[in-house]
Regions:
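Ubiquitin-like/PB1-type beta-grasp interaction modules and other compact soluble beta-rich domains
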Residues: 1-94
Length: 95
């Protein structure tokens, strides 16, 4: 998968986007830039469901890079590289 970043969607995100995964070409992108490219590639706007009013990750949003939570690093400024595997979980709803 040289030159590509695999992005897998889980939970409500997968249902909303109607796809389990996409691949993005890129290297050295921040997570925020990657999310914007995902919106372009899927043709759907979803960032407002993942980010708070201060453009930080909403509580309950989980983004893993190769199994590591981005919250433990630089958050949305975390850089990804070709070959990385990204897992994206939107906040769950219910009641």
């Amino acid at each position: 998968m040289a030159g590509k970043i695999a992005v897998r969607f889980y939970g409500l995100m997968r249902l909303r986007l109607r796809t389990a995964a996409i691949e993005i070409s890129g290297d050295g992108l921040t997570i925020l830039a990657l999310l914007r490219l995902e919106e372009e590639k899927t043709g759907q706007s979803f960032l407002d469901e993942l980010l708070d009013k201060d453009k930080g990750l909403l509580v309950g949003t989980i983004i893993l890079i190769n199994g590591e939570n981005v919250r433990l690093g630089r958050g949305l400024e975390t850089r990804v590289k070709a070959g990385d595997d990204i897992a994206l979980f939107s906040p769950a709803g219910g009641g």
